[in-house]
Amino acid sequence: MTTNLRKTHPLLKMINNSFIDLPTPSNISIWWNFGSLLGACLILQTITGLFLAMHYSSDISLAFSSVTHITRNVQYGWLIRNMHANGASLFFMCIYLHIGRGIYYGSYLYKETWNIGIMLLFTVMATAFMGYVLPWGQMSFWGATVITNLLSAMPYIGNTLVQWVWGGFSIDNATLTRFFTLHFLLPFSIMGLTIVHLMFLHETGSNNPTGLNSNIDKIPFHPYFSYKDALGLILMLTTLLTLTLFFPNLLGDPENFTPANPLSTPPHIKPEWYFLFAYAILRSIPNKLGGVLALLFSILILFLLPTLHTSKQRSMMFRPISQMLFWSLVADLLILTWIGAQPVEDPFIMIGQLASIMYFTILLILLPITSIIENKMLK
């Protein structure tokens, strides 16, 4: 009997063990679809980004007009540009759903996979932020000014650090050039981290909705989950194309249609929708350093989740009180997202502060205590 090439060839064997003959729990739901969707987003963003980079010019006198040139004169430039901009939104939508799934079903107990995932989140956030600066519109310029200025909150070395990042005494040509360089470079780091993420995941195998050991009931990834993932991919691409072709500027900021002007500040500086929750947490503390630390900790807190897990059960599937807290956390994040887009005035300041306190309270105090209570109820 002839041996199958995909099982013997050194390279094909790796692909086979990762995407074809991979033993997968038979009961994983649609929530396990987002990993492959994120992979698809990454590929799409890299391809569209590559074509945009061919026509973009990272000089402050040319950047804005080069983006205009792409959308007007390049063949299908408008499509590539809009797919890249809205693809970022879909990327973050998938990331947040993927992380939410991980929290709900206790996937964070695969510590290495989880930690690499958070590092991926930071890298993607940095990439998205720098990408937003590249069109050199008003919101690009002032967004970059506000966010890079946060580094000055660092004691002693703050101001030096800001000037080092800017490459001068203000945001200028050097800043735009380095942001373009890093925006081009980071996606390849993301690809590398993704491979490590998958490598650690395949050491343990996937978690499943029950949180129980599923070794007794595994099925091959292909054809079962490759087709299931294909459905998710079609739905995601449909959403992306609907956004791109019918509402291309729905998620953008109208201020970015105005070229960057250091002499005119927009009435309300705000980041893209996917950073609004963190921006609201940053603004909820009246102290600069305190705000920056809260902003950092709002993401870094994810590293603590495996340590804060006190339940005897892995998943929240059979824990109704924890479920209520989880959905309260989701609602809280939606409130923070809304507050981040509002001006700094009452009642928004107070709502933002309460929502920020609630965010940390649920994750650090309420969920661990609830898990202990649920353990006692099982006895």
Swiss-Prot record:
Which positions, given as ranges, span the membrane?
34-54, 78-99, 114-134, 179-199, 227-247, 289-309, 321-341, 348-368
Record-annotated residues binding heme b b562? 84, 183
Binding-site positions, a ubiquinone:
202
Give the highest taxon in the source lineage.
Eukaryota
Supply the InterPro entries for this chain.
Cyt_b/b6_C, Cyt_b/b6_C_sf, Cyt_b/b6_N, Cytb/b6-like_sf, Cytochrome_b, Cytochrome_b_C_euk/bac, Cytochrome_b_N_euk/bac, Di-haem_cyt_TM
Q: Name one GO molecular function term.
A: ubiquinol-cytochrome-c reductase activity
Q: Which residues bind heme b b566?
A: 98, 197
Q: What is this protein called?
A: Cytochrome b
Gene source species: Carettochelys insculpta
